[in-house]
Amino acid sequence: MADLNYIDWHIHPFRAERWLEIWRPALDRALAFGARSCYLTRDVDDPLHFRQVTVWDDHADFERYWYSDEITALREAALNYFNKPLSSSWHTVAVDASGVEAPPLK
């Protein structure tokens, strides 16, 4: 079963759009390195908080992606736009309700 990697990005005030412009290509590259899916969410209550979620079959593919020359260069280009340190965390799917049909409402 695939594992999910989460990275919480906390962006400096007035820098979110520029950071997003720099970091957007990194999301596409995750797919090229073998991620099943990749998306970025933005907190409704805190628009400076972004969460990057990637789904991987193999942690080694994430490591190849994260430490690749391309992604390292993008992180360096975005260095002045986000709070450090960055930390990622791994999650496994505990329940997947997508294949379960909901019972009819009464």
List where the protein language model places each region.
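Short S/T/G/P-rich N-terminal loop/turn motif that feeds into the first structured element of a domain
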Residues: M1-T72, Y81-K106
